[in-house]
Amino acid sequence: MKVVAAVNGLITSEIAAFYALRFAAQHGFPLTLLHVENSLDSLEDVERSMAVIEEAASDDDVTTERILLAGNPIKTIRKYLSANRVDTLFCSTSRHRTFFQNSLRQQLTYLPLPVDLAVVQVVRLDAAHAVRNVVLPIEEDRLSVKKFSFFASFAKTYGAATEIYSVTLVDSEILAKMDIHLTRSLLSKINDHLSHYVKLARCMGIPLRIKHSVARNKIDQVLHHLSHHDFQLMIIGGSRQSGLSTLLRGNPIERLLHETPINTITFYGRDDG
């Protein structure tokens, strides 16, 4: 198995590849630096970025390889992933986009892939090198083992403290009726369901705390929480959906990515629908 980082020569892509390197180093995987040639990217910049990552990889004893391909980016990437044993594909995204922009990242999240996908949004360039606190927002107790494993991988490789931030959504009427007893009962049930993750973190030597919030809007609450705490990295779970469904129903993750003040990695499991 190996980790693949899509490199396009931009600094955000380089930072995404650095996160891929940290993930690969933690699991003992080699790292492939992949570029599909196109008219928009400078090959000189791509090779310069690859050289930077290769130098960092040598310090971590991670084996690297360069793969330069040509053709339709999506078809070429899917063909490469299908022909190789890849654990996770990392790519970068930008918070500055037009409404109808159909980026490589968006196309990858719409399509079924034979690998896990990690989409990195870079807000602070320096944060990738010094991560002290990592946060994983979830709704109530909805957390898969695969997502927790991805989250824990970054906590372990950085030696960072972690937080699972559980948000319970309620409407205004229910929120007004909630008393201390009801709230404690609700949060205690969530803690019970998440207790096995606390045990896993303890076995892995990862400092983990669980925090709760009861709110009407998950994204508003997460953004408020981020603004009042010192996190350097946020891991969130994404779900694959078509561009049409995103247009018709909206996508809360897009708003979170647009407004988040910290670097964020959105994790799409290969089996997540």
What function would you assign to each model-found segment?
Residues 13, 70, 144, 215-216, ...:
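A conditional alpha-helix N-cap/helix-loop micro-motif detector
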